[in-house]
């Protein structure tokens, strides 16, 4: 897939890309993110689309995905041998990996924005530039600027998606979300695609089927145009890595709109549906016409629980909160600033990122539990499930844990940090703010690169550092951006707060 995309990007140097060209680039990159597509057949279909578009551009016209008869035989023609990236010098491989993985994560954001009618030419152009960069023989000195440019463009991309989401669904508002599943038929929607959730809410209205979010879909409850649907009831379960246990024998249907899909177990395989770029062998896939009838019928057939089914977060809490995006937090900025000046708030932590199954991720639970009562925890992405059901109190009427949204809502955290720095007349790195990030997949890469591109320093990353980063590149990041590997909550809190 990556080799075909690099080949297409090279063609775009001599043939003007079309809107469809840009879309197929997004689709191809998005498809290769961890836990999106397990289906070799559909991967080849997308590769064929990429090669068809390449052939069409070379012939002077785009065919919008129609496959010329020679596509199968031409599949490898002019495509880059991607193994050259993995066989390169480890420092070159590391930097190209940062660019590639960063673009994959960014493509997910751009794809979601496109589904809501938003795109940005500078973002589209960078994907082609970045892909061509992967296929070129460049030095570390030549690659480093492109690594940081990936982060800069991702900030534009996150802003684009934020604008798309808030234009379509309103500015998120603080919302308490129950974790109990009410009796009766229900569908659990997971992933990140708010448009798919909206379409499902419309199609299930008045049909006696309740809708629950899962994983990164939790922040949907904060958007006014989604929360107005009375049958959007609550949130099911915890983070993605627990799905094989949490989904087993559940009498409801599951819809995956994006990652993270794990290998499906027999105990629930008959009730899992995919859509968009998500694909898994033998599962029913909802195509672009978005007729969710099979999902709805399965939910009605299963019938749901006969009595309300109590579920909790990993710490035993039965509700969580969301909706503290930049619009909400900046709306009470005067209260926050006054609380800082009065000494009621001594420090802010942004604790979030990707969750995973690796031992040691309880670090983030303990970090939040042990954080002093005069500190505020901003959080985002699925890493929040390690602690978002905790009740650690409030400061000045504001909860100490504020969920800012999905991973792409790192944009909200950046907006808040910049606004606070302006209010206090200092740089962002001089704020009483520390980032404590959990690491897993490609979306974490593009967010990390954005933080680096903005010049943010002195943050903590764990529970392990990226395995694909070479010692030399890691040393560069540590020396230039003062990135700390997490150690223990006690030691890190002491180092941060003194």
Would you name each region that the model predicts?
Residues 1-24, 31, 63-67, 94, ...:
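Anaerobic metallocofactor- and corrinoid-dependent redox/one-carbon enzyme cores
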Residues 3-171:
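Electropositive, gly/pro-rich neighborhoods at or near active sites that engage anionic ligands
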């Amino acid at each position: 897939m990556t080799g075909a995309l690099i080949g297409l990007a090279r063609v775009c140097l001599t043939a003007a890309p079309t809107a469809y060209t840009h879309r197929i680039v997004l689709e191809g990159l998005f498809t290769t993110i961890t836990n999106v597509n397990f289906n070799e057949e559909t991967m080849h279909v997308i590769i064929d689309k990429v090669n068809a578009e390449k052939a069409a551009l070379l012939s002077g016209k785009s065919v919008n995905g129609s496959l010329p008869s020679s596509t199968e035989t031409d599949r490898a023609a002019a495509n880059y041998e991607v193994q050259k990236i993995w066989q390169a010098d480890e420092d070159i491989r590391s930097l190209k990996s940062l660019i590639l993985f960063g673009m994959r994560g960014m493509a997910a954001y751009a794809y979601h924005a496109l589904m809501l009618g938003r795109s940005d030419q500078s973002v589209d152009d960078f994907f082609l530039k970045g892909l061509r960069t992967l296929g070129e023989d460049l030095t570390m000195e030549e690659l480093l600027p492109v690594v940081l440019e990936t982060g800069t463009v991702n900030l534009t991309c996150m802003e684009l998606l934020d604008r798309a989401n808030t234009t379509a669904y309103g500015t998120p508002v603080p919302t308490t979300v129950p974790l109990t599943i009410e009796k009766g038929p229900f569908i659990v929607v997971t992933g990140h695609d708010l448009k798919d959730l909206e379409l499902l809410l419309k199609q299930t209205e008045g049909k006696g089927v309740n809708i629950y979010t899962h994983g990164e879909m939790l922040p949907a409850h904060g958007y006014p145009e989604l929360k107005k649907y009375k049958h959007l009831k609550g949130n099911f379960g915890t983070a993605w890595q627990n799905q094989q246990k949490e989904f087993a024998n559940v009498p409801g249907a599951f819809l995956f709109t994006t990652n993270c899909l794990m290998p499906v177990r027999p105990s629930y395989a008959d009730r899992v549906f995919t859509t968009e770029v998500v694909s898994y062998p033998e599962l029913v896939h909802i195509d672009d016409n978005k007729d969710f009838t099979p999902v709805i019928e399965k939910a009605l057939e299963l019938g749901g629980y006969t009595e309300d089914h109590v579920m909790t977060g990993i710490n035993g809490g039965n509700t969580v909160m969301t909706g503290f995006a930049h619009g909400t937090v900046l709306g009470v900025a005067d209260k926050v600033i006054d609380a800082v000046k009065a000494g009621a708030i001594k420090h802010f932590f942004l604790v979030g990122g990707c969750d995973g199954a690796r031992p040691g991720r309880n670090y983030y639970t303990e970090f939040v539990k042990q954080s002093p009562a005069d500190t505020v925890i901003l959080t985002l992405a699925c890493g929040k499930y390690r602690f978002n059901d905790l009740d650690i109190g409030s400061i000045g009427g504001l909860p100490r844990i504020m969920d800012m949204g999905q991973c792409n809502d790192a944009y909200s955290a950046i907006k808040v940090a910049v606004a606070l720095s302006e209010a206090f007349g200092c740089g962002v790195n001089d704020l009483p703010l520390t980032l404590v990030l959990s690491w897993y997949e490609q979306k974490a890469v593009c967010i990390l690169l954005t933080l680096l591109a903005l010049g943010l320093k002195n943050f903590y990353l764990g529970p392990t550092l990226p395995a694909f980063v070479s010692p030399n590149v890691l040393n560069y990041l540590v020396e230039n951006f003062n990135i700390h590997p997490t150690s223990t909550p006690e030691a890190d809190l002491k180092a941060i707060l003194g």
